[in-house]
UniProtKB/Swiss-Prot annotation:
Boundaries of every OBG-type G domain copy: 160-333
Protein name as annotated: GTPase Obg
Subunit and interaction comment: Monomer.
Group of enzyme by EC: hydrolase
Positions contributing to GTP binding: 166-173, 191-195, 213-216, 283-286, 314-316
Annotated keywords: Cytoplasm, GTP-binding, Hydrolase, Magnesium, Metal-binding, Nucleotide-binding
Cofactor: Mg(2+)
Organism of this sequence: Klebsiella pneumoniae (strain 342)
Annotated InterPro entries: G_OBG, GTP-bd, GTP-bd_Obg/CgtA, GTP1-OBG_CS, GTP1_OBG_dom, GTP1_OBG_dom_sf, OBG_GTPase, P-loop_NTPase
Entry keyword Transport: no
UniProt domain Obg: residue ranges: 1-159
Major subcellular location class: cytoplasm
Length: 392
């Protein structure tokens, strides 16, 4: 299946149903009074994270999602039916951005997590709500409010513990094939990975971590050159970055300069990403003897000003790979993710008598009190009756 990590969709919540103006008309009951019911609330639009999805390709074609409108109120005090909600399923790791405001509405990081992205409109009130001792036959009603409407930008960010960095042909795909069951394309000629891939590295029955392979970076990537910059966002949730350096580049380029390009592009893209823990890993040491590889790796590290530990591996022959993976596993165990739970303020519970409806009733009472020409002997059959219309 084609990998798609960005999509734009339109979500429209349902409008609230209108209130009803109706009077009880029954045999032998000459003054039945008002019996107009309220409308129904509009349906909401929700996003739900689903671990069975791994791409946003479904939303390249289906771009509009609309919830159902609430039904209008009816006579005999019948309340309109609430509109049905719409649930849009997205892959785990999807970030939701409101295109109108640029606000990040939420990150879908757990399976089953739900996020309301469009709230349905409030129901309108029927004329039964406006009856009083001085207004026995009210002809007022309120209209339902419109539902929310938003253009959303969906951005899929892969959830991985370890991210791979490096130039094209540094051996990232070969490494992920060596340590996991993932099978990205590899070959003995220059080319680059086109889409990100994930691999699960199982150290034993209880310990494992996820590694992400993204297309290689090239010089000028921060300005849009190549593919890598587009997929760098997938590394934002990684806990450690493995910077693979080809110790003997096939094109004869300088490994030191290649490493500096990667670090420079990383800093241009995001200071937060550049500040993540980064490990230096020299690959393809099987192309020379051990002493030569160690001497060359040490010289490159010194040229880069690298003072921490570095690793020598061969992803093709798996030399040093197991030691590296165990060190990564130990780092992940010793540095667990700290979930900072924000103090959530209690949500305002708004039922039938929310602020909107209360305001409508208060305005109606003011209109009745200010009406100097009120006729308490008004008859339902009077054709000259006045109907009140309220605008939101």
């Amino acid at each position: 299946m084609k990998f798609v990590d960005e999509a734009t969709i339109l979500v429209v919540a349902g409008d609230g149903g209108n209130g009803c103006v109706s009077f009880r008309r029954e045999k032998y009951i000459p003054k039945g009074g008002p019996d107009g019911g309220d409308g129904g609330d509009g349906g909401d639009v929700w996003l739900e994270a689903d671990e069975n999805l791994n791409t946003l390709i479904d939303y390249r074609f289906e771009k509009s999602f609309r919830a159902e409108r609430g039904q209008n109120g009816q006579s005999r005090d019948c309340t309109g039916k609430r509109g049905k909600d719409v649930t849009v399923k997205v892959p785990v790791g999807t970030r939701v951005i409101d295109q109108g405001t640029g606000e990040t509405m939420g990150d879908m990081t757990k399976h089953g997590q739900r996020l309301m992205v469009a709230k349905g409109g409030w129901h309108g009130l029927g004329n039964t709500r406006f009856k009083s001792s001085v207004n026995r036959t009210p002809r007022q009603k309120t209209m339902g409010t419109p539902g929310d409407k938003r253009d959303l930008q969906l951005e899929l960010m892969l959830l991985a513990d370890v991210g791979m960095l490096g130039m094209p042909n540094a051996g990232k795909s070969t490494f992920i094939r060596a340590v996991s069951a993932a099978k990205p394309k590899v070959a003995d000629y220059p080319f680059t990975t086109l889409v990100p891939s994930l691999g699960v590295v199982r150290m034993d029955n209880e310990k494992s971590f996820v590694v992400a392979d993204i297309p290689g970076l090239i010089e000028g990537a921060a300005e849009g050159a190549g593919l890598g910059i587009r997929f760098l966002k997938h590394l934002e949730r990684c806990r450690v970055l493995l910077h693979l350096i080809d110790i003997e580049p096939i094109d004869g380029s300088d490994p030191v300069e290649n490493a500096r390009i990667i670090v420079g592009e990383l800093e241009k893209y995001s200071e937060k990403l550049a500040s993540k823990p980064r490990w230096l890993v020299f690959n393809k040491i099987d192309l020379m003897d051990k002493a030569e590889a160690e001497a060359k790796a040490k010289a490159i590290a010194e040229a880069l000003g690298w003072e921490d530990k570095f690793y020598l591996i061969s992803a093709a022959s798996q030399q040093g790979v197991k030691e590296l993976c165990w060190d990564v596993m130990t780092f992940i165990i010793e540095n667990p993710i700290v979930h900072v739970e924000e103090e959530q303020k209690p949500e305002k519970v708004e039922f039938m008598w929310d602020d909107y409806h209360r305001q409508q009733l208060e305005e109606a009472e003011v209109e009745v009190e200010d009406d100097e020409d009120w006729d308490d002997d008004w008859d339902e059959d009077d054709e000259e009756g006045v109907e009140f219309i309220y605008k939101r």
